[in-house]
Protein backbone atom coordinates (compact mmCIF):
# COMPACT_ATOMS: atom_id res chain seq x y z
CA UNK A 1 0.00 0.00 0.00
CA UNK A 2 1.28 3.48 -0.89
CA UNK A 3 0.85 6.46 1.41
CA UNK A 4 0.87 10.22 1.35
CA UNK A 5 2.87 11.31 4.38
CA UNK A 6 3.86 14.59 5.99
CA UNK A 7 7.48 15.08 7.05
CA UNK A 8 8.06 16.60 10.46
CA UNK A 9 10.50 18.94 8.73
CA UNK A 10 7.50 20.70 7.20
CA UNK A 11 6.90 22.04 10.72
CA UNK A 12 10.56 22.82 11.44
CA UNK A 13 9.62 26.25 12.81
CA UNK A 14 7.51 24.67 15.56
CA UNK A 15 9.12 21.38 16.60
CA UNK A 16 12.15 22.69 18.46
CA UNK A 17 15.89 22.77 17.74
CA UNK A 18 17.43 20.89 14.83
CA UNK A 19 20.16 18.70 16.29
CA UNK A 20 23.13 18.38 13.96
CA UNK A 21 26.74 17.46 14.67
CA UNK A 22 30.24 18.30 13.52
CA UNK A 23 33.32 16.13 13.87
CA UNK A 24 36.54 17.92 14.75
CA UNK A 25 39.93 17.11 13.23
CA UNK A 26 40.76 15.07 16.34
CA UNK A 27 37.63 12.98 15.83
CA UNK A 28 35.54 14.35 18.68
CA UNK A 29 31.93 15.24 17.95
CA UNK A 30 30.38 18.60 18.70
CA UNK A 31 26.65 19.24 18.83
CA UNK A 32 25.42 21.87 16.41
CA UNK A 33 21.95 23.20 17.23
CA UNK A 34 19.82 25.32 14.93
CA UNK A 35 17.46 26.91 17.37
CA UNK A 36 13.71 26.89 16.76
CA UNK A 37 10.96 27.18 19.40
CA UNK A 38 9.08 24.08 20.48
CA UNK A 39 5.43 25.01 20.21
CA UNK A 40 4.42 21.55 19.00
CA UNK A 41 5.32 18.06 20.21
CA UNK A 42 5.78 15.08 17.92
CA UNK A 43 2.56 13.65 19.35
CA UNK A 44 0.65 16.84 18.50
CA UNK A 45 2.23 16.93 15.06
CA UNK A 46 1.04 13.39 14.36
CA UNK A 47 -2.53 14.24 15.31
CA UNK A 48 -2.59 17.49 13.35
CA UNK A 49 -1.12 15.84 10.26
CA UNK A 50 -4.04 13.42 10.35
CA UNK A 51 -6.73 15.99 11.15
CA UNK A 52 -5.48 18.98 9.14
CA UNK A 53 -3.88 17.38 6.08
CA UNK A 54 -5.90 14.17 6.02
CA UNK A 55 -2.96 11.78 5.79
CA UNK A 56 -2.43 8.40 7.41
CA UNK A 57 1.37 8.50 7.66
CA UNK A 58 4.18 10.74 8.84
CA UNK A 59 7.91 11.01 8.46
CA UNK A 60 9.76 11.75 11.71
CA UNK A 61 13.23 13.25 11.28
CA UNK A 62 15.96 12.06 13.64
CA UNK A 63 17.42 15.56 13.99
CA UNK A 64 14.13 16.76 15.53
CA UNK A 65 13.88 14.14 18.29
CA UNK A 66 14.06 15.78 21.71
CA UNK A 67 14.99 12.47 23.31
CA UNK A 68 15.64 8.88 22.30
CA UNK A 69 15.37 7.17 25.68
CA UNK A 70 13.23 4.00 25.65
CA UNK A 71 10.35 5.60 27.56
CA UNK A 72 10.15 8.43 25.04
CA UNK A 73 10.10 6.05 22.08
CA UNK A 74 7.43 3.87 23.72
CA UNK A 75 5.26 6.94 24.31
CA UNK A 76 5.70 8.06 20.72
CA UNK A 77 4.80 4.62 19.36
CA UNK A 78 1.69 4.63 21.54
CA UNK A 79 0.72 8.03 20.13
CA UNK A 80 1.09 6.75 16.57
CA UNK A 81 -1.03 3.70 17.33
CA UNK A 82 -3.69 5.70 19.17
CA UNK A 83 -3.97 8.14 16.27
CA UNK A 84 -4.23 5.32 13.74
CA UNK A 85 -1.12 6.68 12.01
CA UNK A 86 1.95 4.93 10.69
CA UNK A 87 5.52 6.12 10.54
CA UNK A 88 6.69 5.88 6.96
CA UNK A 89 10.28 7.08 7.10
CA UNK A 90 13.02 8.15 9.46
CA UNK A 91 15.62 10.42 7.83
CA UNK A 92 18.87 10.09 9.81
CA UNK A 93 21.34 12.96 9.68
CA UNK A 94 24.34 11.86 11.69
CA UNK A 95 27.77 10.81 10.54
CA UNK A 96 29.74 11.20 7.34
CA UNK A 97 29.91 7.92 5.47
CA UNK A 98 31.91 9.66 2.73
CA UNK A 99 34.91 10.32 4.98
CA UNK A 100 38.17 8.48 4.31
CA UNK A 101 38.74 7.78 8.02
CA UNK A 102 37.58 4.18 8.49
CA UNK A 103 37.41 4.41 12.29
CA UNK A 104 35.13 7.44 12.11
CA UNK A 105 32.91 5.71 9.58
CA UNK A 106 32.67 2.63 11.80
CA UNK A 107 31.59 4.84 14.70
CA UNK A 108 29.03 6.56 12.48
CA UNK A 109 27.69 3.20 11.28
CA UNK A 110 27.20 2.00 14.85
CA UNK A 111 25.36 5.16 15.86
CA UNK A 112 23.19 5.04 12.72
CA UNK A 113 22.28 1.41 13.46
CA UNK A 114 21.07 2.50 16.90
CA UNK A 115 18.61 4.79 15.13
CA UNK A 116 17.56 1.87 12.91
CA UNK A 117 16.46 0.11 16.09
CA UNK A 118 14.40 3.15 17.08
CA UNK A 119 12.88 3.38 13.60
CA UNK A 120 11.87 -0.28 13.81
CA UNK A 121 10.30 0.26 17.23
CA UNK A 122 8.23 3.09 15.75
CA UNK A 123 7.06 0.91 12.87
CA UNK A 124 8.93 2.69 10.07
CA UNK A 125 9.23 1.20 6.60
CA UNK A 126 12.25 3.23 5.46
CA UNK A 127 15.41 4.70 6.95
CA UNK A 128 17.30 7.36 5.03
CA UNK A 129 20.99 8.08 5.49
CA UNK A 130 23.30 10.44 3.65
CA UNK A 131 25.79 9.45 0.98
CA UNK A 132 28.48 11.44 2.76
CA UNK A 133 27.21 14.44 4.67
CA UNK A 134 24.58 16.87 3.35
CA UNK A 135 26.04 19.08 0.64
CA UNK A 136 29.46 17.42 0.75
CA UNK A 137 31.64 16.29 -2.13
CA UNK A 138 32.55 12.60 -2.03
CA UNK A 139 36.05 12.16 -3.43
CA UNK A 140 37.19 9.18 -5.45
CA UNK A 141 39.40 7.92 -2.63
CA UNK A 142 36.36 7.82 -0.34
CA UNK A 143 34.20 5.81 -2.77
CA UNK A 144 35.16 2.31 -1.60
CA UNK A 145 34.60 3.19 2.05
CA UNK A 146 31.22 4.75 1.32
CA UNK A 147 30.11 1.66 -0.60
CA UNK A 148 31.28 -0.65 2.20
CA UNK A 149 29.47 1.39 4.85
CA UNK A 150 26.24 1.44 2.87
CA UNK A 151 26.46 -2.31 2.29
CA UNK A 152 26.81 -2.85 6.03
CA UNK A 153 23.92 -0.51 6.79
CA UNK A 154 21.80 -2.04 4.04
CA UNK A 155 22.28 -5.51 5.50
CA UNK A 156 21.45 -4.22 8.97
CA UNK A 157 18.31 -2.49 7.74
CA UNK A 158 17.18 -5.59 5.85
CA UNK A 159 17.64 -7.72 8.97
CA UNK A 160 15.23 -5.40 10.80
CA UNK A 161 12.61 -5.35 8.06
CA UNK A 162 13.59 -1.83 7.01
CA UNK A 163 14.56 -0.48 3.59
CA UNK A 164 17.70 1.66 3.45
CA UNK A 165 17.56 4.78 1.27
CA UNK A 166 19.94 7.53 0.22
CA UNK A 167 18.69 10.90 -0.95
CA UNK A 168 19.83 13.55 -3.37
CA UNK A 169 20.79 15.89 -0.54
CA UNK A 170 23.10 18.45 -2.09
CA UNK A 171 26.72 18.23 -3.18
CA UNK A 172 27.78 15.07 -4.99
CA UNK A 173 24.63 13.23 -3.96
CA UNK A 174 22.44 15.50 -6.10
CA UNK A 175 23.96 14.12 -9.29
CA UNK A 176 22.24 11.13 -10.95
CA UNK A 177 25.67 10.22 -12.34
CA UNK A 178 26.76 9.68 -8.73
CA UNK A 179 23.63 8.17 -7.17
CA UNK A 180 22.86 5.52 -9.77
CA UNK A 181 26.37 3.99 -9.87
CA UNK A 182 26.41 4.14 -6.06
CA UNK A 183 23.18 2.17 -5.86
CA UNK A 184 24.54 -0.36 -8.34
CA UNK A 185 27.78 -0.76 -6.36
CA UNK A 186 25.99 -1.21 -3.03
CA UNK A 187 23.33 -3.46 -4.55
CA UNK A 188 19.67 -2.81 -5.31
CA UNK A 189 18.75 -5.34 -2.63
CA UNK A 190 20.51 -3.21 -0.01
CA UNK A 191 19.86 0.36 -1.15
CA UNK A 192 17.00 2.40 -2.58
CA UNK A 193 16.80 6.01 -3.70
CA UNK A 194 14.73 8.72 -2.05
CA UNK A 195 14.14 11.25 -4.81
CA UNK A 196 13.69 14.76 -3.39
CA UNK A 197 12.08 16.95 -6.05
CA UNK A 198 13.79 20.10 -4.78
CA UNK A 199 17.28 18.98 -3.77
CA UNK A 200 19.08 19.78 -6.99
CA UNK A 201 21.27 22.71 -7.95
CA UNK A 202 20.59 25.57 -8.05
CA UNK A 203 17.50 25.16 -5.87
CA UNK A 204 19.24 23.31 -3.05
CA UNK A 205 21.73 26.18 -2.70
CA UNK A 206 18.93 28.74 -2.61
CA UNK A 207 17.04 26.74 0.01
CA UNK A 208 20.08 26.33 2.26
CA UNK A 209 20.97 30.03 1.95
CA UNK A 210 17.48 31.07 2.95
CA UNK A 211 17.56 28.66 5.86
CA UNK A 212 20.58 30.47 7.27
CA UNK A 213 19.05 33.89 6.50
CA UNK A 214 21.62 34.54 3.77
CA UNK A 215 20.48 36.75 0.91
CA UNK A 216 20.75 34.98 -2.43
CA UNK A 217 19.67 35.78 -5.98
CA UNK A 218 16.71 33.59 -6.91
CA UNK A 219 15.35 35.16 -10.09
CA UNK A 220 16.16 34.27 -13.66
CA UNK A 221 17.68 30.91 -12.74
CA UNK A 222 17.66 27.95 -15.10
CA UNK A 223 15.77 25.04 -13.52
CA UNK A 224 15.74 22.83 -16.62
CA UNK A 225 18.71 20.72 -15.43
CA UNK A 226 16.76 20.00 -12.25
CA UNK A 227 13.76 18.65 -14.15
CA UNK A 228 16.11 16.60 -16.33
CA UNK A 229 17.66 15.09 -13.19
CA UNK A 230 14.21 14.25 -11.82
CA UNK A 231 13.41 12.45 -15.08
CA UNK A 232 16.70 10.55 -14.81
CA UNK A 233 16.12 9.37 -11.24
CA UNK A 234 12.34 8.88 -11.16
CA UNK A 235 12.38 5.39 -12.75
CA UNK A 236 14.76 4.27 -9.98
CA UNK A 237 13.03 5.92 -7.01
CA UNK A 238 11.81 3.94 -4.01
CA UNK A 239 10.31 6.97 -2.26
CA UNK A 240 9.57 10.58 -3.23
CA UNK A 241 9.89 13.82 -1.28
CA UNK A 242 7.42 16.37 -2.65
CA UNK A 243 9.61 19.34 -1.73
CA UNK A 244 8.55 22.96 -2.03
CA UNK A 245 10.03 26.22 -0.78
CA UNK A 246 9.05 29.88 -0.95
CA UNK A 247 8.80 31.17 -4.54
CA UNK A 248 11.42 33.40 -6.12
CA UNK A 249 11.11 37.17 -5.85
CA UNK A 250 9.57 37.25 -9.33
CA UNK A 251 6.96 34.65 -8.33
CA UNK A 252 8.60 31.65 -10.01
CA UNK A 253 7.61 28.50 -8.08
CA UNK A 254 10.56 26.63 -6.57
CA UNK A 255 10.11 24.06 -7.92
CA UNK A 256 7.19 23.89 -10.34
CA UNK A 257 5.71 21.07 -8.30
CA UNK A 258 2.95 20.02 -10.74
CA UNK A 259 5.58 19.70 -13.45
CA UNK A 260 7.96 17.76 -11.22
CA UNK A 261 5.20 15.40 -10.10
CA UNK A 262 4.04 14.86 -13.67
CA UNK A 263 7.58 13.75 -14.54
CA UNK A 264 7.47 11.27 -11.66
CA UNK A 265 4.02 10.02 -12.71
CA UNK A 266 5.16 9.58 -16.31
CA UNK A 267 7.97 7.32 -15.09
CA UNK A 268 5.38 4.85 -13.79
CA UNK A 269 6.02 5.56 -10.12
CA UNK A 270 3.26 4.27 -7.83
CA UNK A 271 4.99 4.34 -4.43
CA UNK A 272 4.59 6.55 -1.39
CA UNK A 273 5.20 10.30 -1.33
CA UNK A 274 6.21 12.39 1.68
CA UNK A 275 5.50 16.13 1.78
CA UNK A 276 8.38 18.36 2.80
CA UNK A 277 7.56 22.07 3.01
CA UNK A 278 10.87 23.88 3.54
CA UNK A 279 9.74 27.49 3.18
CA UNK A 280 9.89 30.19 5.80
CA UNK A 281 6.86 32.27 4.79
CA UNK A 282 3.20 31.69 5.57
CA UNK A 283 1.46 29.13 7.75
CA UNK A 284 3.22 25.75 7.40
CA UNK A 285 -0.01 23.77 7.77
CA UNK A 286 -1.66 25.77 4.99
CA UNK A 287 1.39 25.29 2.77
CA UNK A 288 1.49 21.58 3.54
CA UNK A 289 -2.22 21.20 2.73
CA UNK A 290 -1.67 22.97 -0.59
CA UNK A 291 1.15 20.57 -1.47
CA UNK A 292 -1.03 17.62 -0.46
CA UNK A 293 -3.77 18.78 -2.84
CA UNK A 294 -1.23 19.10 -5.65
CA UNK A 295 0.15 15.62 -5.00
CA UNK A 296 -3.30 14.03 -4.90
CA UNK A 297 -4.14 15.48 -8.31
CA UNK A 298 -1.33 13.41 -9.82
CA UNK A 299 -1.49 10.46 -7.41
CA UNK A 300 -5.11 9.99 -6.26
CA UNK A 301 -4.43 6.39 -5.18
CA UNK A 302 -2.32 7.39 -2.18
CA UNK A 303 -3.75 6.47 1.21
What kind of feature is each model-predicted range?
Residues 1-121, 188, 192, 209, ...:
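N-terminal pre-domain/capping segments
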Residues 10-12, 62-64, 93-96, 131-135, ...:
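Active-site-proximal loop/turn and secondary-structure-junction residues that shape catalytic pockets
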Residues 18-20, 57-58, 90, 150-262:
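Acidic/histidine-rich catalytic cores of soluble enzymes
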Residues 42, 73, 108-115, 143-146, ...:
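Aromatic/hydrophobic pocket-lining residues that form the small-molecule binding cavity
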Residues 54-55, 119, 124, 237, ...:
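A structural motif
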Residues 85, 162, 267-271:
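A short helix->loop->beta-strand "cap" motif at the edges of active sites that frequently abuts
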Residues 119-139, 160, 165-173:
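Active-site groove signature of glycoside hydrolases
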Residues 272-280:
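Short acidic/histidine-rich active-site segments
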Amino acid sequence: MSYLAVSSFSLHKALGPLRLEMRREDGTLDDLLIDFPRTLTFEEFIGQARDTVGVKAVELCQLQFDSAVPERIEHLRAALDEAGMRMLTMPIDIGDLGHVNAAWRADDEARIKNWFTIAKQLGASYVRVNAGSPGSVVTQDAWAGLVASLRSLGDAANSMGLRLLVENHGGTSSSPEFLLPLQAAVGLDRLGILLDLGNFDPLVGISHARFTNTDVEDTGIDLEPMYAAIARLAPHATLIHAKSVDPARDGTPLPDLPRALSIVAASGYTGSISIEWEGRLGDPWERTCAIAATVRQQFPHLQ
